[in-house]
């Protein structure tokens, strides 16, 4: 098996925070064996799904999505959060490939900083961990299912003989009782 290809999509909006998320994600991925990292910057959070899609279409095994959306005085926050979340989720299901969701949706800048290497860890690193775990899982499940199917194909032949033998024994017992 070749190298695992992972895309990292980072929004430039709130770049003082997103750059820390990106550092955490890339640092984690660089420590993994046989991983090839591809990175792209996008203007804002709404553009994240399109860049994720481009990476998946180009053959990446998974993507890390990084951004920061901080609540303001208007409903724009809700639309952006829903748009990004729905877009990334749809891509995962359509492409059957994992996207680690490291898009912070916070009430203020302090909360975002706390999650970009502060008191609450680095959510960029965590998103990279999730991506790698899910790449492994999505590769293991088909292999395990194939093995299980192969075992199941062998098992019914043995199981079919057992009921026939049991039925024959039952018939012999019935004959003995009738005599």
Curated annotation (Swiss-Prot):
InterPro entries: LS, LS/RS, LS/RS_sf. 5-amino-6-(D-ribitylamino)uracil binds at residues 13, 45-47, 68-70, 101. The active site is at 76 (proton donor). Pathway: Cofactor biosynthesis; riboflavin biosynthesis; riboflavin from 2-hydroxy-3-oxobutyl phosphate and 5-amino-6-(D-ribitylamino)uracil: step 1/2. Residues 157-179 are annotated as: Disordered. One of its GO terms (molecular function) is 6,7-dimethyl-8-ribityllumazine synthase activity. It catalyses: (2S)-2-hydroxy-3-oxobutyl phosphate + 5-amino-6-(D-ribitylamino)uracil = 6,7-dimethyl-8-(1-D-ribityl)lumazine + phosphate + 2 H2O + H(+). CDD domains: Lumazine_synthase-I (cd09209). The keyword Transferase applies. (2S)-2-hydroxy-3-oxobutyl phosphate binds at residues 73-74, 115. Keywords: Riboflavin biosynthesis, Transferase. Pfam families: DMRL_synthase (PF00885). Its EC number is 2.5.1.78. The keyword Transferase applies. Disulfide bonds: none annotated. One of its GO terms (cellular component) is cytosol. One of its GO terms (biological process) is riboflavin biosynthetic process. Belongs to the DMRL synthase family. Catalyzes the formation of 6,7-dimethyl-8-ribityllumazine by condensation of 5-amino-6-(D-ribitylamino)uracil with 3,4-dihydroxy-2-butanone 4-phosphate. This is the penultimate step in the biosynthesis of riboflavin. NCBIfam families: lumazine-synth. PANTHER family: 6,7-DIMETHYL-8-RIBITYLLUMAZINE SYNTHASE, 6,7-DIMETHYL-8-RIBITYLLUMAZINE SYNTHASE DMRL SYNTHASE LUMAZINE SYNTHASE. This is 6,7-dimethyl-8-ribityllumazine synthase.
């Amino acid at each position: 098996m070749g190298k695992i290809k992972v895309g990292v999509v980072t929004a430039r909006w709130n770049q003082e925070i997103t750059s820390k998320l990106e550092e955490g994600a890339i640092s984690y991925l660089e420590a993994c064996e046989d991983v090839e990292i591809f990175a792209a910057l996008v203007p804002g959070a709404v553009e994240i799904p399109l860049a994720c899609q481009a990476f998946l279409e180009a053959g990446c095994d998974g993507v890390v999505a990084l951004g920061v959306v901080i609540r303001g005085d208007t409903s724009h926050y809700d639309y952006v959060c829903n748009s990004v979340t729905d877009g990334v989720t749809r891509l995962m299901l359509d492409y059957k490939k994992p996207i680690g969701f490291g898009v912070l949706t916070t009430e203020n800048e302090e909360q975002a900083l706390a999650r970009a290497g502060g008191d609450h860890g680095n959510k960029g690193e965590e998103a990279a961990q999730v991506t790698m775990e899910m790449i492994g899982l999505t590769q293991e499940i088909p292999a395990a299912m194939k093995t299980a199917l192969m075992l199941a194909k062998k098992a019914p032949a043995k199981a079919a003989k057992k009921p026939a033998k049991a039925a024959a024994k039952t018939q012999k017992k019935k004959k003995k009782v009738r005599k």
